[in-house]
C-alpha cells in the first residue's frame, strides 16, 4: 500500500495496529491521525467517517510518485482539512513494462502483486496514449491469535501524456479484513474491521515552464465498513457504515510580471449512512476551500535572493462557521560558495478543519464511543523557522516549529468512565525540532532523522486520565535508513527507529523502543530481471505499543521473488 513506504520516513510517524498495511494512523509533527491529510494530484482524498480510513488509498504504489510531506505554509496552501500536515502524491508517468512478485512467510503469510503498463507511439500533438493495470493480494493469520488479515486490490488507469502535460483517469477497488486484540478499544477483546474502498479519479496537470503550472481534478470515493467490537461475544452487535465523497479541486502557480500567484480551490460533498452513528445533527456536508497567495522576489548582493509570500485561505461548510486564515513566508536564498544553507526561511500559517462523523454522531451518553454533536471548527496557528541545504552527496533540512491548536478533537479515557472512549476538544500547544540529512552515493544511501516534541494540553472540564492520540507522541525519535549496494547483485536495507514516547496510562509496555527491519536482496548478474528477497520486520521482537493498549505485532519474516520485464 502507499502507506508502506512511510513506515520509517523521518517526517512521518506511522502508528500501526498489526502491520501498517493492516491499519495505520499517520501523524505529522506530533499531530494525530485526523490532522493528517492526503492528496493525489489536484484532489484532496478524505474519509468523512473517521481519519483512521484516510490512508485507505486503493492505488498501486507503482502508479504514484514518491510522497511529499507538506507542513507549515505549504500545508496551509496545499492541504485540506489537515492542521498538522499533508501527504501529497502525483500520478506517475506510465512506461511500457511490468513486474510480478510473490512471497511467503511465517504465520501463514503469502503475498502477490502484478503490474503492467503499455505506452503507444507518439500521436497528434506529441502526446502518447498509455494504460496500466495492477493487482495485489495478501493473506496472513497474524503474529497474534485472532490477528488475521486479508487484502485484495485491483487498479486500472488510462493516461494521455506529452512534454507539457498529463491527464490520468484512474479506478481502484480494494477489500481488507483485519482482526486484532484491542484494535480500537482498550477492553481486552478481539475486534475486527471489514472494509471495501472504491476510488475513481480524473486528474490533469499542465507544466507551463519556470515553475508555473495548473492542475485540476475530480473524484468519487466510497468506503463500506463493517466493524465488530467483540468477535467472540454476542454484544454489542456489529456496526455498519458507508460513506460517499464527491470532490473537485484545482491548484496552480502563474507568473505575471514580478509576481507569482499561488492558488487553489476545493469543493467536497460527503454523505454517511450508518446504523450506529445516528446521534448527530446531520449526515451530509459540503466543504468549500479557496486560497490565494502572491509572492515576489528581490535580488540582493552576494548571490542572495529574498522571496516574500503572503495570502489567505477561506474555509467553509454548510454546517459550520467559516474561517479566514492568513499565510506568510519569508525566504532568503543564498547561492554564494560556503554559505551555511541554500535557503533560510520563516513562516506563519493559520489553518482550520472540522471533525468527522464518528466524533460528531456517536451517542453522547452511552456506548463504547461517546461523541459530541456540538464539536466546532478546529483551528491551528503554525510558526516555523528553518533551513535547507545541499553539498556534494549530502542534502539536509532543519526546522524549529510551534503549533497552537484550539478545539482539537481527541479521544480520551477516564477512570470515572472506564468502558468508553470520549471525543473531547482540547487546546494544545506543540513545540518541536525536526532534522533530516540524506546521503546518496554509488554504494551507500543514508537517511537520518531526529524529531523532538513537547506538548502542553488543556482539556478544560473533561476528565482525561489518558489520551489515545493527542498525547501519544515521541518526545524524542531517531530514524536511520541505510541501503548498502554490496556488489555482485547483493543489496542490504536496514531501517531503524529509536524513540522515547510520552508516558501514557493506557500503554502497558515500556515507553522506550528500538525498532528495526532488514531486507537482503540478490539480483543474479546474468539475469537482472529477477530479484530475490528475504526480509524481517520487528527484528528485535519489540512489544512497544504504537497506539496505547494495542498489542504490537511480533517479529515476522517473509521471502519472495520479483520478476520485471
Predicted regions and their residues:
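C-terminal beta-signal and adjacent terminal beta-strands/loops
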Residues: 501, 520-565
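Flexible loop and strand-edge segments within Gram-negative outer membrane beta-barrel domains
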Residues: 140-151, 165-247, 277-278, 282-283
Amino acid at each position: 500500500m502507499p502507506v508502506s513506504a512511510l513506515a520509517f520516513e523521518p517526517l512521518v510517524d506511522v502508528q500501526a495496529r498489526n502491520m501498517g498495511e493492516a491499519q495505520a494512523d499517520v501523524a505529522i509533527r506530533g499531530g494525530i491521525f485526523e490532522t493528517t491529510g492526503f492528496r493525489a494530484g489536484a484532489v484532496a482524498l478524505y474519509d468523512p467517517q473517521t481519519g483512521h480510513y484516510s490512508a485507505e488509498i486503493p492505488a498501486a504504489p507503482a502508479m504514484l510518485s514518491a510522497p511529499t510531506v507538506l507542513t507549515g505554509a505549504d500545508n496551509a496552501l496545499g492541504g485540506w482539512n489537515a492542521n498538522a500536515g499533508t501527504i501529497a502524491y502525483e500520478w506517475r508517468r506510465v512506461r511500457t513494462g511490468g513486474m510480478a512478485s510473490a512471497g511467503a512467510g511465517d504465520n501463514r503469510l503469502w503475498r502477490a502483486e502484478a503490474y503492467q503498463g503499455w505506452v503507444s507511439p507518439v500521436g497528434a500533438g506529441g502526446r502518447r496514449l498509455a494504460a496500466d493495470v495492477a493487482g495485489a493480494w495478501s493473506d496472513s493469520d497474524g503474529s497474534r491469535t485472532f490477528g488475521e488479515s486479508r487484502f485484495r486490490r485491483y487498479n486500472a488507469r488510462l493516461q494521455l501524456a506529452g512534454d507539457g502535460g498529463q491527464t490520468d483517469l484512474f479506478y481502484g477497488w480494494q477489500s481488507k479484513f483485519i482482526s486484532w486484540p484491542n484494535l480500537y478499544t482498550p477492553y481486552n477483546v478481539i475486534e475486527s474491521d471489514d472494509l471495501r474502498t472504491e476510488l475513481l479519479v480524473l486528474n490533469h496537470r499542465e507544466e507551463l515552464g519556470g515553475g508555473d503550472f495548473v492542475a485540476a481534478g475530480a473524484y468519487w470515493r466510497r468506503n463500506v465498513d463493517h466493524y465488530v467490537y467483540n468477535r467472540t461475544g454476542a454484544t454489542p452487535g456489529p456496526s455498519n457504515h458507508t460513506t460517499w465523497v464527491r470532490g473537485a479541486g484545482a491548484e496552480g502557480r502563474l507568473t505575471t510580471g514580478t509576481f507569482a500567484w499561488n492558488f487553489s480551490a476545493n469543493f467536497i460533498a460527503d454523505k454517511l449512512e450508518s446504523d450506529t452513528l445516528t446521534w448527530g445533527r446531520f449526515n451530509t456536508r459540503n466543504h468549500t476551500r479557496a486560497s490565494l497567495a502572491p509572492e515576489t522576489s528581490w535580488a540582493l548582493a552576494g548571490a542572495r535572493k529574498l522571496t516574500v509570500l503572503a495570502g489567505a485561505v477561506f474555509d467553509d461548510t454548510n454546517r459550520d462557521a467559516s474561517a479566514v486564515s492568513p499565510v506568510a513566508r519569508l525566504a532568503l536564498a543564498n547561492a554564494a560558495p560556503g554559505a551555511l544553507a541554500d535557503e533560510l526561511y520563516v513562516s506563519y500559517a493559520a489553518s482550520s478543519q472540522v471533525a468527522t462523523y464518528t466524533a460528531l454522531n456517536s451517542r453522547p451518553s452511552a456506548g463504547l464511543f461517546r461523541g459530541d454533536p456540538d464539536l466546532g471548527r478546529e483551528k491551528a496557528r503554525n510558526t516555523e523557522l528553518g533551513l535547507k541545504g545541499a553539498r556534494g552527496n549530502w542534502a539536509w533540512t532543519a526546522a524549529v516549529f510551534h503549533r497552537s491548536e484550539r478545539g482539537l478533537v481527541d479521544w480520551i479515557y477516564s477512570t470515572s468512565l472506564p468502558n468508553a472512549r470520549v471525543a473531547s476538544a482540547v487546546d494544545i500547544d506543540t513545540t518541536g525540532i525536526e532534522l533530516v540529512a540524506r546521503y546518496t552515493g554509488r554504494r551507500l544511501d543514508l537517511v537520518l532523522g531526529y524529531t523532538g516534541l513537547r506538548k502542553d494540553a488543556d482539556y478544560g472540564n473533561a476528565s482525561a486520565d489518558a489520551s489515545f492520540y493527542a498525547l501519544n507522541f515521541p518526545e524524542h525519535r531517531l530514524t536511520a535508513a541505510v541501503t548498502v549496494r554490496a556488489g555482485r547483485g547483493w543489496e542490504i536495507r536496514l531501517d531503524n527507529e529509536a524513540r522515547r514516547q510520552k508516558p501514557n496510562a493506557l500503554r502497558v509496555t515500556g515507553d522506550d523502543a528500538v525498532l528495526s527491519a532488514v531486507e537482503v536482496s540478490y539480483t543474479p548478474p546474468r539475469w537482472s530481471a529477477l530479484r530475490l528477497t528475504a526480509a524481517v520486520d520487528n527484528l528485535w521482537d519489540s512489544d512497544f505499543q504504537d497506539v496505547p493498549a494495542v498489542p504490537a505485532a511480533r517479529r515476522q519474516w517473509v521471502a519472495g521473488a520479483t520478476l520485471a520485464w
